[in-house]
Amino acid sequence: MVEQDPFEIAVKQLERAAQYMDISEEALEFLKRPQRIVEVSIPVEMDDGSVKVFTGFRVQYNWARGPTKGGIRWHPEETLSTVKALAAWMTWKTAVMDLPYGGGKGGVICNPKEMSDREKERLARGYVRAIYDVISPYTDIPAPDVYTNPQIMAWMMDEYETISRRKDPSFGVITGKPPSVGGIVARMDATARGASYTVREAAKALGMDLKGKTIAIQGYGNAGYYMAKIMSEEYGMKVVAVSDSKGGIYNPDGLNADEVLAWKKKTGSVKDFPGATNITNEELLELEVDVLAPSAIEEVITKKNADNIKAKIVAELANGPTTPEADEILYEKGILIIPDFLCNAGGVTVSYFEWVQNITGDYWTVEETRAKLDKKMTKAFWDVYNTHKEKNINMRDAAYVVAVSRVYQAMKDRGWIKK
């Protein structure tokens, strides 16, 4: 488990970025606090006839740049501090991507693994009834996150529409929906595809040709699998190692993404894949590869192993895989980190495209969506990279400077703060 309080980390990162910016004390004070926190109690009738009361949250961190945007997490250990931190990070993520959004996040303390589909539906609808007054297509737009999925989003959207009597473009109140109810087809691989564009641009910045180069991917869920598939099939890279929570596999000649996925589905893990050597998650991180993509959990690159990282590019598909101490070590070693809230922003960017289509009624092809995503990710990468070069600071600090500057400007233009 993560030791530090998540919201304290978020505030520290903001304070660190402020050192490299011309930002007033009052603006910084404002940015250290969420604009709105909603806590709700949701009574849900369980299948056995009993009623269980769940606690839910919705945090709208900052709406200077537009409606707040962010996922809904269902987790037995959900805390308000985590939701606040993630809402702050969503604020910077939408700003670094230059999307017309602020940042938000929601959560419910529950264990979905122990709930039936009927119970989940009742909880989803109850949550929407509880937070109905603070969400809409123009104020706060939720999406799926930990243990929530397109089906749960469809129930939530339906409940919102039932209450609102379809008075606004209600498909646009929630993103990450099934395509049959206004969802976007390109959402499935959006996070990995967005990350692949940033890796391509990082390689250009380093003068590296990706064809034939090696990549190791920690985590083989949605993002890890699609990252392996895209980097090998579209960029000609060799995926030499992948892992999941039970361990990893290594093959210097390269692994086939689809075959490994089929093996994982059959056995429950990538481990023992035919023709590959079993390795630990720790060993995977320290392999001699060109690109390392931590795509699983937080805080895996720490001061203990940072010195042993040999990759030239670290692409953070996971949230917070590198600790601040490790950041410094990797920067000193000349390793280029593509920070999480830039690298994994493909998901929220395609969510934005879904929302635009729901509001306008204009639906795009997968090819059009990918071309627009490419353009957005490429511009965001160079905005951050150029700031990193100009200010001589690491990529994470540069991403914060770009993002916070944009939110700060919007706050000044609105007259919320005078300087």
Swiss-Prot record:
Q: GO cellular-component terms in the record?
A: cytoplasm
Keyword Oxidoreductase on entry: yes
Disulfide bond annotation, renumbered to this chain: none
Detail the relationship between temperature and activity: Optimum temperature is above 95 degrees Celsius.
The active site is formed by K105
The Gene Ontology biological process terms listed for this entry are:
glutamate catabolic process
Q: Which reaction does it catalyse?
A: L-glutamate + NAD(+) + H2O = 2-oxoglutarate + NH4(+) + NADH + H(+); L-glutamate + NADP(+) + H2O = 2-oxoglutarate + NH4(+) + NADPH + H(+)
User: EC number(s) for this protein?
Assistant: 1.4.1.3
Q: Keywords assigned by UniProt? A: Cytoplasm, NAD, NADP, Oxidoreductase
PROSITE patterns for the chain:
GLFV_DEHYDROGENASE (PS00074)
Q: Which SUPFAM superfamilies match?
A: Aminoacid dehydrogenase-like, N-terminal domain, NAD(P)-binding Rossmann-fold domains
- Please list the GO terms describing molecular function: glutamate dehydrogenase (NAD+) activity; glutamate dehydrogenase (NADP+) activity
Q: Where in the cell is it found?
A: Cytoplasm
What is the activity's pH dependence per the UniProt entry?
Optimum pH is 8.0.
UniProt-annotated binding residues for NAD(+) = G219, Y220, G221, N222, A223, G224, Y225
Q: Which PANTHER family match?
A: GLUTAMATE DEHYDROGENASE, GLUTAMATE DEHYDROGENASE 1, MITOCHONDRIAL
> Quaternary state and partners of this protein?
Homohexamer.
Family from the record: Belongs to the Glu/Leu/Phe/Val dehydrogenases family.
Identify this protein by name.
Glutamate dehydrogenase
Gene designation per UniProt: gdhA
